[in-house]
Design a protein with these regions (language model features):
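Alpha-helical scaffold domains
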Residues: 1-251
Length: 251
């Protein structure tokens, strides 16, 4: 007998309520979504425990369970959905891009957006960038600002794909397309993308930042140049003084 995703989703919901039993809309982060207030570490442990207890679950069943959890719109259930898929590569591969695209309708804060991008969409696109990069381009043009942020966060994981240098030009175009966007903390997300790509493509990223310093967000230019120079996004603070400013970018 196969796994019933509705029953399993209800069991996970019950477990999450015991971690933080009062459903609340008072935000830990700026969100209109309900949440229980459970810690991220407990959510990861919940996902890991479920997988240990259901080793016979098929990839399709796990993908369906993740969908049930995500579409509740509750923070903890959405994050458990991400962590389930992140721990099971076959289930991730069984999660269609159309399904993840539909999930973006429930994004309204940086936490769930970033967890979806890091754990699900980014790794999913990295499995087959040639066929799947188009979704990031589509999301970059979405009127929903959190969908646009999702495109950038997912691009950080493409730096781990096979032959990453092949995909850098597409990521660079994505960055330029969103360079002037100030919604959903997109300037900081641009910095994250650039710094993620320094490991596989340091020369290309450095040249890109130099060539486009006037277009890219100032924080992205500053933090990327700092990481190139020091290994961290923040320049070292001199004894008794402020950290030096790094030239480039818009004021």
């Amino acid at each position: 007998m196969g796994l019933d995703p509705d029953t399993e989703a209800a069991a996970i919901t019950a477990a999450l309520r015991t971690l933080a039993p009062e459903l609340t809309t008072v935000p830990m982060i700026k969100t209109s979504r309900p949440f229980y207030g459970a810690r991220v570490g407990d959510l990861r442990a919940t996902a890991a425990g479920w997988l240990r207890a259901h080793r016979d679950a098929t990839p399709a069943e796990l993908a369906e369970l993740a969908d049930r959890l995500w579409t509740t719109g509750v923070r903890e259930e959405q994050l458990v959905a991400c962590f389930l898929l992140a721990r099971d590569r076959a289930a991730l591969a069984a999660t269609g891009l159309d399904r993840v695209r539909a999930w973006t309708a429930l994004l309204d804060n940086w936490e769930t957006t970033d967890q979806l991008g890091m754990n699900v969409l980014g790794p999913l696109v990295a499995l087959d960038p040639g066929r799947r990069l188009g979704l990031l381009e589509e999301l970059a043009g979405d009127p929903h600002p959190w969908a646009r942020r999702l495109a950038l966060v997912a691009a950080t994981r493409l730096a781990r794909a096979d032959d990453p240098a092949r995909w850098w030009p597409a990521v660079a175009e994505l960055l330029l397309r969103l360079a002037g966007d100030r919604q959903a903390a997109l300037p900081k997300a641009s910095s994250w993308v650039l710094r993620s790509w320094l490991e596989p493509c340091p020369d290309q990223v450095a040249a890109f930042v130099d060539a486009n310093a006037g277009r890219l967000p100032a924080v992205a230019v500053r933090e990327t140049r700092a990481k190139l120079a020091t290994g961290t996004k923040r320049p070292p603070r001199p004894p008794g003084g402020r950290r030096p400013a790094i030239a480039g970018g818009r004021p």
